[in-house]
Amino acid sequence: EFSGSCAGCAETSYARLITQLFGEHMYISNATGCSSIWGGPAATAPYTVNKDSKQGPAWANSLFEDNAEHGFGMYLGQKTLRDQAIAKLEKMAASDKASDEFKAAFAKFMETKDNTKENTPDAQALIAEVEKAAAAGCPDAAEVLEKKQYLAKKSVWIFGGDGWAYDIGFGGLDHVLASGENVNVMVFDTEMYSNTGGQASKASNIGEVCQFAAAGKEISKKSLAEIAMSYGYVYVAQIALGANPN
């Protein structure tokens, strides 16, 4: 809410919609560019928390050239910590000292552990049981509580513009897409370098005239979507909020 974007900028509308869907359990790695300027200017930030849960996105800004790697590192880091916590929970559940309530909460958590939407309430219920075990002196429970913020399934997103995704950061982006890991990428495709004044990018269309590319682009637009689809296991969607007013 209340971003510092330029008048008429549509990027914030997409970011707002994504955060409304996933924001309570969302990590964002943001490439330097327009989306980092309106997304994290000094002394203020448009990313906020849900008024009921008081939870919201965790946001970080990366350099232009390594945002995909940065976001992938965020994903792998939280995944590793979560896996460590789950291993401790499995050990606790196998103990004859575990309560029936804990075992039931853990079983329910494991049923939804890969579902971002459904897993959050199950994780909260499980944490309540772990706190009881910790109060009773269980050392494994105390270790799990140190990582409790990672228990709920997270939705990890990598944000950036076409200058990052199509050009300077493409190598890293391709590596992340090829990994097959559960990472989401949002490319704000303005079809030129918007933040630096208007240079042509590989997302610019043939013949396109930009402020600092007045002669017109001589080659066609790179099809990033088709490149991603060529792997056969990457889901690709192209969206335009203004395409259908209804």
What are these regions (language model features)?
Residues 143-145, 150-183, 188-246:
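Glycine-rich ThDP/TPP pyrophosphate-binding loop and its adjacent helix/strand module
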Residues 20-27, 48-54, 94-95, 150, ...:
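Secondary-structure transition/capping motifs at alpha-helix termini
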Residues 64-140:
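N-terminal leader/propeptide and maturation segments of large enzyme subunits in energy/redox metabolism
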Residues 27-37, 43, 80, 84, ...:
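Carboxylate/His-rich catalytic cores and anion/metal-binding grooves
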Residues 10-14, 21-22, 30, 77, ...:
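General structural feature for long, well-ordered alpha-helical segments within catalytic domains
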Residues 1-5, 61-97, 152, 207-246:
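Conserved thiamine diphosphate
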